[in-house]
Structure formats: C-alpha cells, structure tokens
C-alpha cells in the first residue's frame, strides 16, 4: 500500500501529482516540473531532422584543391631566413605565422618555416608585429 504523502503510482513520484520531483510523470522528471508541465514547452514543433530540408549529405564537401607543400613540390626551393620575400608569404599582415592548414605546408617544412621566421625576427629582417594600429 502506498503512503498518502508519497503519491500514488500514477502521480509522478515523490511529492504528489506534477510536483516536478524525482519521478517521471507529467512533471517532467528530475527537477523539471515547473511552468505548464507537459513536454511541449513554448518552442513549438521543431520537426524531425529529416524534415528540415537542406543538402542530402554524403560525399565530400567542395573545398577545392588540396594544398601541396611548396617545398616538397619544388625540391630546389629551400627555407631561408635571409629571404625576406619568401618568409613574408608565411606571415599575416599583423606579423603572425600562418598555420599549416592555411599555408599548405607539411609538418616538417612548417617547423622549418617557423624557425626561419623566428631567426629573421631576431635579426630584425622580419617584424614581430606591425607598427602603429
């Protein structure tokens, strides 16, 4: 026999009907309860994921060509900290080193480029930052 203060089997757990307590029921489960009860809320029907339209998915996205490391492609090209024009290609307009996902360098040559840029900065060939803002 259920105790009167615990609510019956169809009341939604501890604390009576729609208490918002621990049980399931209409109150919304663990601490949910609150305003209006039920599961609708004020968000309306959002529909299933399938009904939202958009692309069918599958396949690759159109990112264009894969970037190739210019130092691996042209074996004659070497990373040189003294070549300011070459090193500026791997710097943003604010003086930051461009990451390899954008520059297309392989890991080996990206490390060499970063080291060369840092050497060039120390010798005042390349800027640490851009001048006045």
From Swiss-Prot:
GO terms for molecular function: small ribosomal subunit rRNA binding; structural constituent of ribosome. Binds as a heterodimer with protein bS6 to the central domain of the 16S rRNA, where it helps stabilize the platform of the 30S subunit. Part of the 30S ribosomal subunit. Forms a tight heterodimer with protein bS6. This is Small ribosomal subunit protein bS18. PANTHER family: 30S RIBOSOMAL PROTEIN S18, SMALL RIBOSOMAL SUBUNIT PROTEIN BS18M. It comes from Anaeromyxobacter dehalogenans (strain 2CP-1 / ATCC BAA-258). InterPro entries: Ribosomal_bS18, Ribosomal_bS18_sf. HAMAP family: Ribosomal_bS18. Keywords: Ribonucleoprotein, Ribosomal protein, RNA-binding, rRNA-binding. Residues 40-59 have a biased composition (Basic and acidic residues). It comes from the Bacteria. GO terms for cellular component: cytosolic small ribosomal subunit. Residues 1-63 are annotated as: Disordered. GO terms for biological process: translation. The keyword rRNA-binding applies. Belongs to the bacterial ribosomal protein bS18 family. Residues 9-39 have a biased composition (Gly residues).
